[in-house]
Amino acid sequence: MNPTELISTGGLNAVWVSVGYRLSVFGFLAGEALRDESHGKEVGNYGLWDQRLALEWVSENIAAFGGDPHNITLAGRSAGAYAVQAQALYDFQKADAPKDLFRRLMMHSNSIPTQPKSPEDCQPQFDEVCQYFGIPSEYSGQEKMRKLRQISAQDLTDAIMNLDHHTFRPVTDGVFIHPGIFDFYRNGEFAAEFKRRDLRLYIGEVLNEDTLYAITNGPEASLDSLKLQLTNYYPPSTTARLLQHYSLPTSTDKKDWQDIFGRIVADGQVRAPYRFLVNNLLSHGVDIQNVWRYCIAYRLSFITEKVAPASMGVSHSMDRPLWK
């Protein structure tokens, strides 16, 4: 996000910090070799740890730039919104975590929908990366990591979309993301900590989240392809349960399969989890004045047919200019 207009013409009195962190294979590769390398500790969530370091740096140093370390808003869109929630969970569940790193959470078009995959769930992805680069399967984990680190960043980046398992996401490592996070919601502990810290949440979506998801890494016209693309997002058991709740296409038209993929992912990544989060907070006593929801249904006039077909409506990320 670019806050130039908010600050220069909108009168926003704020110091804006954009956090750079490791993405994709660099930030979220997980598997047995990485678990062994860390001696059973942190694995897979390197991008989240980068964010964490940045949060702590801002808290410690923002006053030198005219900011208020006790008045920080943590914000993100899409995967960034997912990360905002992950950072809050980490903070709430770690007894020795600083208690005042942020006062507000802004989550645009994403939320945590289910318990993230375990490193074991991600092993096929790790193995596929090794196979793609010709690293023998009989190599030890240490040898595999040594070979992977010899590959250039550009070659790794170029390989990603040639993989079946091309989406690298946070994992349940037991250190940053703990097992049973939804028990933490259901028993009221998340809401209790939210209230204790007197936090605020601003969260929402755009009207047609599904239309961009449908054409981004969408499936071919088959059930197997649909399952494969969904397992890039969710553990196999979650994918199986999801598919029980949707009427699947019977045609061989690729667009039909892309459309159902877009709907499932938009429901799973945005609509259902953020409603669950809001409902959980309110049902456990968080004041409704501290939870703000929105839905943007207005398509900006400069988003012309050249930019995106009108049939996409107000799709994922089309609200970005509104926050500038």
Regions found by a protein language model. Give the residues of each.
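Catalytic lobes of large eukaryotic enzymes
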Residues: L226-T252, S311-W323
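Active-site rim elements
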Residues: G40-N45, S111-K117, I181, K255-G268, ...
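Cap/lid segment of the alpha/beta-hydrolase catalytic domain
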Residues: M1-R52, E60-A64
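Mobile gating loops/cap/lid regions near enzyme active sites that modulate substrate access
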Residues: R275, N279-K324
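Short glycine-enriched nucleophile-adjacent loop
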Residues: A81-D96
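Conserved alpha/beta-hydrolase "nucleophile elbow" surrounding the catalytic nucleophile
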Residues: R77-S78
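Alpha/beta-hydrolase fold catalytic core
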Residues: P235-G285, W292-Y298
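Substrate-access "cap/lid" subdomains that shape
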Residues: L53, E60, A64, N71, ...
